[in-house]
């Protein structure tokens, strides 16, 4: 979802506080607070960043505490999510951090699954098969959305 730029605060119950992926879950389960700007890792080459795994609920708010709460529906699996000042397209188009535009929106992703990132070493390690998402199998996401 594309949100107004002022909705940059993130509070969530999941694996954190740093970014986590299926193959990068060395984190504690807890309630964490951050914002989209702190969650964006300034890698030398802009790329996927800021994902959070095993999320039970997340609140995206403005400075007054108004916003959106996403929570897993009763009986549903935890989800993955991120809140970033850049879209996936913006990250793919930029070769360096200084090529990213000034943020005008926040980009909220809520995912049933997020593929692993690989990189067991620093030179082209692929994602291990157990962290792939099979394209021939159904995936479901069941969440509740509430205004706060």
Where in this protein do the model-derived segments appear?
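Beta-strand/loop-rich accessory regions of lumenal/periplasmic or secreted enzymes
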Residues: 1-148
């Amino acid at each position: 979802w594309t949100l107004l730029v002022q909705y940059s605060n993130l509070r969530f119950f999941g694996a954190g506080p740093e970014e986590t992926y299926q193959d990068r879950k060395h984190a504690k389960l807890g309630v964490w607070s951050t914002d989209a700007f702190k969650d964006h890792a300034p890698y030398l080459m802009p790329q996927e960043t800021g994902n959070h795994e095993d999320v039970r609920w997340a609140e995206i708010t403005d400075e007054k505490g108004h916003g959106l709460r996403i929570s897993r529906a009763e009986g549903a699996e935890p989800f993955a999510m991120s809140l970033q000042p850049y879209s996936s397209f913006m990250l793919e188009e930029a070769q360096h951090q200084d090529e990213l535009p000034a943020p005008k929106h926040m980009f909220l992703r809520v995912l049933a699954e997020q593929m692993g990132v690989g990189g067991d070493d620093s030179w082209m390690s692929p994602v291990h098969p157990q962290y792939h998402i099979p394209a021939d199998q159904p995936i479901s996401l069941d969440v509740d959305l509430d205004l706060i």
